[in-house]
């Protein structure tokens, strides 16, 4: 899976392994009805001390990251993740994606982007997700939805 070689980057930063675009596509793709990555799969790509941040939480450590992913899957009837674009430059990667969550018969769609920073060992040491949590979550809810759309209109228009 990993090709062992050294890549020399600016400022004398050296990565001994490189995660490929295909590796990231595999991690960031999950059709409805398929299993989420296993703990072993996460451990292949994530540093033991990974820092994960998204609009709803911040975790530190691989076990906490895995628990956060497991909690998301357990809260939902099903989850999908579709990758649109991936870019890797030196020790930084970006993944553009769409996540779908089916909860109690309703589907919530979240377009987003992930920024990944790779450590010297080539594993992901920081994972930060950027997406709008409130609009897709509360937009479809009666009473809250119109209020959220009104509030957004005050900031965006």
What are these model-predicted stretches?
Residues 1-14:
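Short, Lys/Arg-enriched N-terminal segments with co-localized hydrophobic residues
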Residues 7-8, 19, 125:
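Short linear motifs centered on Gly/Pro in flexible linkers and helix caps
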Residues 16-48:
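Short acidic-aromatic low-complexity motifs
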Residues 20-30, 69, 81, 112-114:
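A generic structural signal for ordered secondary structure
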Residues 30, 56-58, 101-102:
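Short histidine/acidic/glycine/proline-rich micro-motifs that form metal-
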Residues 32-35, 54, 105:
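Flexible interhelical turns and helix-capping residues at alpha-helix boundaries
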Residues 39-91:
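A solvent-exposed, acidic/Ser-Thr-rich amphipathic alpha-helical stretch
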Residues 74-80, 87-157:
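A beta-strand edge to alpha-helix "cap/lid" segment located at domain peripheries
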